Amino acid sequence: MPKHLSPEQVAAYERDGFVFPIDVLDADEVRALRGELEAWERDRGAPIDFPEKSKSYLLFDWADRLVHHPKILDAVEDVIGPDILVYHSTLFLKEAHTPAFVRWHQDSTYFYLQPHLHVTAWVAMSDATVQ
């Protein structure tokens, strides 16, 4: 029995290789996490960028809390099992009206992990529309 996902969501992941949306954070949690990121940016006087954007969970308590969030881990466990390791994490901040985007891709091409049993948990921390 899945811990967080429905049996239908697990089946969709197994069939399609992805499943969305998955509710894991409430509005207060998102506000708090984003607030800590924005406070760091204000203190620094610039938006977060590399190298801090990569593996940020090693640098920031708020990012560590996010990658260890029980609902995220439960959803991941539902599709790959309980042996979970955070291998990589990148913050991708796309402000409104900017041309930034990420093309459809498969991380296994770049990570060289065997077996190819890994997932990406994309967590939105702002409202977004189709437009």
PLM regions: where:
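Extended, low-complexity, turn-rich repeat/linker tracts enriched in Gly/Pro/Ser/Thr and Asp/Glu
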Residues: 127-131
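Non-heme Fe(II)-dependent double-stranded beta-helix
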Residues: 1-16, 20-113, 117
